[in-house]
Amino acid sequence: MINILVVGSGNIGSRHIQGLVKSNKKKFIHIVETSYKSKINTIKRIKDINSNFNNYKFYENIPIINKKLNLIIISTKSGPRLKILKKILSTCTFENIILEKICFKNIKEFLEADKLLRLNKKVAYINFSRREFKF
């Protein structure tokens, strides 16, 4: 079974979850979300894809998961992202991590995150939809 942690299930996070639910692979999705509205929206989007899918659980905080996570997606605002990354690096065992949107709010946090990822021998993938800017 594939174990996945999604931190933040707002608009983009819930779309990631929809894509995961579409996969035919057996999976369990751990979802960290504090907003009631986002939780309801995420459940609706899950059920729109597969009304029988129940292999997910919501948390208010990053959970301690005793199994290795195959994938972590951090889809929050950039402000708390470094703190979230530090918590994940100290409490979770994982294979792959995706950072959504603008990674961090400034270059200092970006460089600190880069250093932490290197120290922990982890590679982060950045999903940034604005790949080209025309001036």
Regions found by a protein language model. Give the residues of each.
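N-terminal Rossmann-like dinucleotide-binding module
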Residues: 1-51
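A short helix-to-beta-strand connector/capping loop
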Residues: 48-57, 119-123
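Short alpha-helical
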Residues: 11, 36-38, 79-80, 105, ...
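Beta-loop-alpha module in the N-terminal Rossmann-like domain of NAD(P)-dependent dehydrogenases
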Residues: 53-116
